Regions:
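Amphipathic, Lys/Arg-enriched alpha-helical "gate/interface" segment within cytosolic domains
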Residues: 1-134
Length: 134
């Protein structure tokens, strides 16, 4: 699976990294795999997709991805703030399409090319360390 994630309960932040080519099914499986015990009311997501290749995704896939994400968080959180960090225009455009595919008071997504700007938007202090266990 091209995704890894870790939840940091003290920050209420899900940190996820995507690498390599990704299919619709892999994205959907990733959404299903996320398990967060005792979540805070507001979920912050820092999605580092700078090394993710979404070139196999179709326009219709974007709607399915957003629906899957909304289904995962509805009735669990008062608010979701996702900062998606990308490195190229294709991924940036697909991420903006994803954000615009549904309006939701619950789910606020912004797309960035700079991870520090994304962290700032999520109101994560600059000294916050988000990493995976070895």
């Amino acid at each position: 699976m091209p995704f890894r994630y870790r939840y940091f309960p003290e920050k209420g932040c899900l940190y996820t990294v995507g690498k390599g080519k990704v299919s619709l099914q892999e994205f959907l499986d990733y959404h299903l795999s996320i398990q967060i015990d005792n979540p805070k009311p507001v979920l912050r997501i820092l999605a580092d997709y700078r090394e993710l290749d979404p070139s196999d995704l179709k326009t219709s896939d974007i709607e399915k991805l957003k629906e899957s994400a909304l289904n995962k968080v509805e009735a669990k959180y008062a608010k979701v703030r996702e900062a998606t960090v990308v490195s190229d225009l294709l991924t940036w455009g697909l991420s903006r399409q994803y954000d615009g595919s549904y309006y939701s008071e619950l789910y606020d997504l912004q797309v960035f090319t700079d991870i520090d700007e994304a962290r700032s938007w999520l109101e994560l202090p600059p000294e916050t360390v988000l990493k995976f266990d070895a």
